[in-house]
């Protein structure tokens, strides 16, 4: 059985005679007749009967007509889905993240991608940076987000944003700093930084910014993540430095002061495998590159 035979059969059934079906299909009548005979022989049943009114369907023909229409419709949809998958319009994008990009930059980027590619879906998994690199190389994830990824010849790293830094203090201390401050204003402030793992890390970058400015920071502790640092800040037990994506969230009892000065920014990075990119990843990478330029 061939798709051509199904197409011919549907045309004959709808037109009611071979000549009209041939005209609709833009073919001569003999090929249609031969294909209908071959189809009936293949199925072992009579589908069409000639009468004074033209060609009529047998009971088997009526049943087969319904199935033939469904088969061609399904084949058409399958073709559409296959072409869409080849373009990267459908499929699931597997995304891993580590650290604070999950607070703002990553959701906004994914929202823009899903708006432009509404038939795609996204899965999110928390992974350390080393786990992300391993997952990218193994093909278990498509793309990763964090800061300060380790370099590897098999993956590419694209910086998608640069974020301002903010001092986070308990609101009872907000009068000491106002809306903005400089690194030099923080010489005497004992800081709680994060994260504890994933070196080089956001904490390493903050310490490096202080030292580049000729200041030795006072580090009270390094905790697991931003949530732990801000929990201590809410409790009045710590002050911290956080990126803008974290400061944009309303945290009870915490005041933020933007840290001003040259080089006082940190990147958010996206990483993906350089080669053998599935279509949905290639489409997302195009989106990432456009966003990075903007």
Swiss-Prot record:
Example of a GO biological process term: catabolic process
Highest taxon in the source lineage: Bacteria
MF terms in GO: DNA binding; DNA-binding transcription factor activity
Ranges where the HTH lysR-type domain occurs: 1-58
UniProt entry tagged with the keyword Transcription regulation: yes
GO cellular component, one term: protein-DNA complex
Coiled coil stretches, renumbered: none
PROSITE patterns to which the protein is assigned, alphabetical: HTH_LYSR
Pfam annotation, one family: HTH_1
DNA-binding region: 18-37
Keyword terms: Activator, Aromatic hydrocarbons catabolism, DNA-binding, Plasmid, Transcription, Transcription regulation
Similarity annotation: Belongs to the LysR transcriptional regulatory family.
Its job: Involved in regulation of chlorinated catechol metabolism. Transcriptional activator of the tcbCDEF chlorocatechol oxidative operon. May bind 2-chloromuconate as an inducer.
Protein name: HTH-type transcriptional regulator TcbR
Organism field: Pseudomonas sp. (strain P51)
Name of the encoding gene: tcbR
